[in-house]
Amino acid sequence: MNILITNDDGIASSGIKALEAVLQKEHDTFLIAPLRERSATSMALSIYDSMRVERINDNHYIVDGYPADCVNIGLHGDIFPRIDLVLSGINRGVNMGHDIHYSGTVGAARHGAVHSRLSLAVSSGNITKDYDYIREAEFVRYFIDEYSSLLKVGVVYNMNIPFDFVSSMENLRITRLGKRTYEDTYSKKNIIGGIADFYLGGSKLEHATEEGTDFTAFFSGKISLTPLSLDQTDISLVQELSDTLSKSLS
């Protein structure tokens, strides 16, 4: 299988190195990643500016752009053979609930899904400095080898692995997205007249406890796998709104 590996933590991150080290034993891997940290960039693309792309060798490229840029170049830049699977991660920190809308890790995988590739985003709850993520990568390899035939194109599979996890399929749960709330705080500096620099000082994160969600699985020590559709239409509201508007116009 031809696997494109990318992330939003940057080319030097331990997570992406672990995936490549483990997967290249049995697959053809092609690594293309951002030059630097690009967290919370979702599916951003560099549309109006050029990007500097550095070729290390035939299988390794560095992009001074966003994670989705990396996927786009990897798929359409005539640098790799046809890619079968877009794999994004291993992210240093989880991406659950509403996080997925901000995440560059998930955004990169979603870009692969938009272009009809199998797409998997992987995040870890282990943010220990200098951690190597090899155990997580080994689980990802096993999952891909044994279950990739069950995956569908046009879907993003979002995997979150707890800090202390049992590496077995019996420990994996198929989940839905939970609900995350954010309480953001900003600081202002360099105030001159009506101009100031705003800095996001941090976010207080909370989540709802509901059965069947990624949060519930994760915090009970299970690996969560959430299938994410590209179609974000709220089907339940389509007919309801249509009927309501029709009545208001009649």
UniProtKB/Swiss-Prot annotation:
One of its GO terms (molecular function) is nucleotide binding. A divalent metal cation binds at D8, D9, S39, N91. It is an enzyme of class 3 (hydrolase). SUPFAM superfamilies: SurE-like. Its main location: cytoplasm. Binds 1 divalent metal cation per subunit. The keyword Chaperone does not apply. The keyword Magnesium does not apply. It is found in: Cytoplasm. GO terms for cellular component: cytoplasm. It catalyses: a ribonucleoside 5'-phosphate + H2O = a ribonucleoside + phosphate. It comes from the Bacteria. PANTHER family: 5'-NUCLEOTIDASE SURE (PTHR30457), 5'_3'-NUCLEOTIDASE SURE (PTHR30457:SF12). Belongs to the SurE nucleotidase family. This is 5'-nucleotidase SurE. The gene is surE.
